[in-house]
């Protein structure tokens, strides 16, 4: 059987043989130089670093040399998935292939797909750190020679620069020029390493600072925020030059936007825009747009308006960008009707240009589509942004594109897709040090879990979002997390808890939720408030919701508004309003929201003693919830069906079969720990009715306490689930 690093059908060593051939070791000339110099690269100190590595004594020196060369190559990009086998084997010289065999056997390295991957970074790092500086520089010289003639000049220049022993301004200039070249090829991590090394070779302090700022920005784009901050600190950007100071402030603000307090990010970005306005209007505009993003995340509408309304030093050459700023400014000033047309131009422009647009342009189009309520266009633009970021970079935008896409799918009612993209985005954000985006992904996952019925997942993801949202001032993530908790309460019939969570978010005052989210939570609040005797608060929230819904900001809003009005109306009007709500649901997609309306309508019909009609609505609700994976809500629909006398497939057998449907509902609520008053609120009956039924439950089952009832129900339900 072939080893893990070999091609199917190839014998062990074939892959290494091809690597040696491609590195030129089979020819004369430079191969001899590599072999002689590589033997001299390491000494006793470096070999001692291998004490914990199982390796034949005859190969220890060669293995140390190989690890030194591998680590020197990794200095070029520590995030890369391995290093080029042909390059490192060629640089390591004689004995390298046998040393690689030993390293694989010891679990230190692995050769696969023409790349040498580091499995245990400790030995290689220790060797690189303990060899004398001259030997480290020699390793870089060998790597520069091995890269010569390759497709890129940057690695050759980087290793030559790393082998330099004194300030070498010309070499530093060449390295910086290569790092600045646009287009594909070097990764952001590689460009960062090149800029940082070119800074070390600079004589002028101002030039050194500029290059370190470039290195920091490339480290940020590579998903290395800690390295980026180290480089910024080395730059020491308190000099008199606006351009240098503004560049440092821009990178600092963008870093804080990724994983720091967003209020700090906003201030740094506004300072950057001011400093760069006269010398670099393009980057000044980027700073202003990032300040808008920070203000949005912190839920500060006034700060959004301020950043949007800043007058650029020069007219914006991009018409779509000007339309975006004009449209968003109108929206933030409360004029969605005015802002809709320019924002639609932004969306249409992205659709026309398609895949040729940058991820940033597509993300703006996706955001504009969300604001005007065009959810299909939002999902298309954000999906395209994700594809472009993955294909062409920058990789730092992948987690953001996934977050925007997941949120759009959540709004569109495609919860399974939203979960898949948010899970991917969470992994990506955490891997890139983007804690703020990770918090948003956690909040989205909490909302999805509140639909799918996992209260544990809701609590876990909401808590994770809030742990970052609180210190970093992420009002949007915090509002989404609180909404998810409240919706889980609703799914579990805990109306009072849901109303208590949502009341501050949808109302006025300092605890008001994020301006772009709070209206979305109003239908949940109205459902909870009307079920707990808070009709006036529900009416006030519904009046504001009606004004918002009339602007067309969300396709589900008309149906939700009719549902809210039905819950607040008298018996004469309620049926007509529920019917109107269902008609509005028919005009848009979204099984979950339609199912909620059917559930509330069916429950009301049951309480009006119209069980036959109620069953039809409740069965429709059950189908909608099951189709959308809303398991907790499906359980509510089944419970309501049982209360109508419907003998569904989930009817209990065994001891609980002696209970009536209403007694069974009360027994289950009590088993969950609900008080009589809480049960009454859930089932829309009086506490006296609950008390009456509960006495009969105790008598029928022969139990004498609520604790005993809870154990009885738990055993019976487990027996039914697992016969």
What residue spans do the PLM features occupy?
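Alpha-solenoid helical repeat architecture
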Residues: 57, 73, 111-115, 151-155, ...
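Extended alpha-helical scaffolding segments used for macromolecular assembly and cargo binding
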Residues: 117-118, 134-227, 231, 245-247, ...
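Helix-turn-helix DNA-binding segment
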Residues: 642, 649-723
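Internal alpha-solenoid helical repeat scaffolds
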Residues: 2, 189-192, 200-440, 448, ...
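Short secondary-structure boundary elements
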Residues: 1-8, 12, 16, 25, ...
């Amino acid at each position: 059987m072939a080893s893990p690093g070999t091609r199917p059908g190839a014998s062990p060593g074939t892959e290494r043989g091809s690597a040696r051939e491609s590195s030129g070791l089979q020819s004369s000339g430079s191969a001899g130089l590599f072999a002689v110099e590589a033997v001299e690269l390491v000494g006793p100190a470096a070999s001692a670093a291998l004490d914990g590595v199982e390796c034949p004594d005859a190969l220890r020196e060669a293995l140390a040399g190989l690890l030194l060369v591998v680590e020197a190559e990794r200095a070029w990009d520590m995030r890369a998935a391995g290093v080029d086998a042909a390059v490192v084997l060629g640089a390591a010289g004689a004995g390298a292939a046998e040393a690689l065999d030993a390293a694989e056997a010891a679990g230190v390295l692995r050769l696969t797909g023409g790349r040498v991957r580091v499995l245990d970074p400790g030995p290689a790092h220790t060797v690189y750190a303990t060899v004398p500086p001259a030997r480290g520089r020699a390793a870089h010289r060998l790597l520069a020679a091995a890269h010569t003639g390759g497709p890129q000049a940057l690695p050759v220049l980087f290793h030559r620069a790393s082998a330099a022993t004194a300030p070498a301004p010309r070499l530093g200039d060449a390295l910086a020029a290569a790092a600045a070249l646009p287009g594909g090829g070097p990764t952001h991590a590689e460009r960062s390493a090149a800029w940082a090394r070119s800074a070390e070779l600079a004589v002028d302090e101002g030039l050194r600072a500029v290059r370190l700022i470039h290195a920091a920005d490339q480290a940020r784009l590579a998903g290395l925020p800690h390295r980026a901050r180290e480089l910024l600190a080395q730059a020491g950007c308190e000099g008199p030059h606006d351009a240098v100071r503004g560049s440092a402030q821009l990178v600092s603000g963008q870093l804080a936007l990724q994983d720091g307090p967003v209020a700090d990010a906003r201030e740094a970005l506004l300072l950057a825009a001011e400093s760069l306005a006269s010398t670099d209007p393009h980057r000044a505009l980027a700073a202003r747009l990032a300040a808008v993003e920070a203000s949005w995340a912190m839920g500060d509408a006034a700060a959004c308006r301020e950043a949007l309304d800043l007058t650029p030093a020069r007219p914006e050459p991009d018409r779509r960008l000007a339309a975006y700023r004009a449209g968003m400014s109108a929206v933030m000033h409360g004029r969605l009707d005015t802002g809709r047309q320019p924002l639609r131009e932004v969306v249409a422009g992205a659709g026309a240009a398609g895949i040729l647009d940058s991820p940033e342009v597509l993300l703006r189009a996706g955001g504009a589509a969300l604001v005007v309520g065009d959810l299909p266009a939002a999902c298309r633009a954000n999906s395209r942004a994700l594809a472009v970021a993955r294909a062409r970079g920058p990789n730092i935008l992948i987690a953001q594109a996934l977050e925007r896409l997941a949120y759009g799918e959540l709004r569109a009612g495609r919860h399974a897709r939203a979960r898949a993209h948010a899970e991917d985005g969470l992994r990506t954000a955490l891997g890139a040090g983007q804690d703020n985006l990770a918090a948003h992904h956690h909040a989205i996952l909490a909302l999805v879990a509140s639909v799918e019925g996992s209260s544990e997942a809701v609590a876990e993801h909401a808590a994770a979002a809030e742990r970052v949202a609180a210190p970093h001032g992420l009002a949007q993530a915090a509002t989404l997390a609180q909404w998810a908790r409240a919706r889980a309460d609703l799914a579990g019939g805990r109306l009072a808890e849901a109303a208590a969570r949502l009341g501050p978010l949808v109302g006025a005052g300092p605890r008001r939720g994020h301006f772009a989210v709070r209206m979305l939570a109003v239908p949940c609040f109205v459902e909870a408030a009307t079920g707990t005797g808070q009709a006036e608060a529900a009416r006030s929230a519904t009046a504001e919701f009606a004004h918002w819904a009339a602007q067309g900001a969300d396709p589900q809003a008309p149906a939700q508004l009719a549902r809210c009005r039905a819950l607040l109306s008298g018996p004469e009007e309620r049926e007509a309003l529920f019917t109107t709500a269902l008609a509005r649901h028919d005009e848009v997609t979204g099984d979950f929201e339609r199912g909620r309306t059917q559930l509330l309508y069916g429950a009301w019909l049951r309480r009006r003693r119209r069980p036959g009609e109620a069953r039809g609505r409740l069965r429709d609700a059950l189908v909608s919830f099951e189709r959308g994976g809303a398991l907790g809500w499906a359980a509510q629909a089944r419970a309501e069906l049982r209360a109508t006398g419907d003998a569904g497939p989930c009817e209990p057998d065994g001891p609980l079969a002696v209970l009536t449907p209403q007694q069974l509902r009360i027994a289950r609520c009590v088993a969950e720990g609900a008080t009589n008053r809480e049960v009454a609120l859930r089932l829309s009956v009086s506490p006296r009715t609950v008390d009456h039924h509960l006495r009969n439950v105790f008598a029928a089952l022969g139990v004498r306490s609520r604790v005993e009832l809870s154990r009885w129900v738990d055993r019976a339900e487990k027996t039914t689930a697992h016969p």
